[in-house]
Amino acid sequence: MSSTRAAIRYAKAIIEIATSKNAANEVSNDMFLIATTINSNSELDTFIQNPTIKVEAKENALLEVFANTNEVTKSLFHLLFENKRFEILGAIASEYNKLFDEINGIQVAKVTTAIAMDANLEAKVKAKIATFSDKKVTIENTVDASIIGGFILRIGDKQYNASVANRLQVLKRELSN
C-alpha cells in the first residue's frame, strides 16, 4: 500500500517536471516502455526487486537498458538510486501513464472477448464506447474463452456485459423464477 502511494507521489512529481520541460509525451513513451519491459521480463523485475543487489548496480543497469530515454526519465533513475526505491519503478511507470492519460482526457477501455477482436467487433465496441464516454478512448483487449462470445466492456467504474455467458446466466435466472 505504501509503495503504491510512493509510486503515485513519484509519478506526480515526474509528470510535473516533464510538463515544465515540454517532455511529457516523450516521458510517457519512456514510462510505457519501462512498464512493459519490466512486466514482460521476469529477470529484469527480479533484478530490480532483489535487495541484495547494490543500488549503484541497479542504476547503471537501468541506464544501460534504457539508454535512449529522456533526461527526465534518467533523472528518475538517479532519484530512485538516492532514495533506494528501485523496487517501485514499474509501479511509478504505470501510475505516470494513468496520470498522463487523465491529464490528456484519454480513457482506457478494457474489453474482454472470447477470441481476439476483429474489425467488426471493434466497430461494435467503439459504438458502445461512444455511449459511455465523450473522451478519447484507447482499447485494451483481453481474451477470455469462458465468456463464450460477445464482449465485456469496462471504462472507469462502468461495465457493459454483452457476453454470451452473461446472457445464459440471465436466461437461467429468468427460467428458475
From Swiss-Prot:
Compartment annotation = Cell inner membrane
The record's disulfide annotation reads: none
For this UniProt record, give its keywords in alphabetical order, as a comma-separated list. ATP synthesis, Cell inner membrane, Cell membrane, CF(1), Hydrogen ion transport, Ion transport, Membrane, Transport
A matching Pfam family: OSCP
Q: Which domain of life is it from?
A: Bacteria
Q: Name one GO cellular component term.
A: plasma membrane
Q: Which family does it belong to?
A: Belongs to the ATPase delta chain family.
Complex formation: F-type ATPases have 2 components, F(1) - the catalytic core - and F(0) - the membrane proton channel. F(1) has five subunits: alpha(3), beta(3), gamma(1), delta(1), epsilon(1). F(0) has three main subunits: a(1), b(2) and c(10-14). The alpha and beta chains form an alternating ring which encloses part of the gamma chain. F(1) is attached to F(0) by a central stalk formed by the gamma and epsilon chains, while a peripheral stalk is formed by the delta and b chains.
Q: Which PANTHER family match?
A: ATP SYNTHASE DELTA CHAIN
**Name this protein carries in UniProt:** ATP synthase subunit delta
Q: Which gene encodes it?
A: atpH
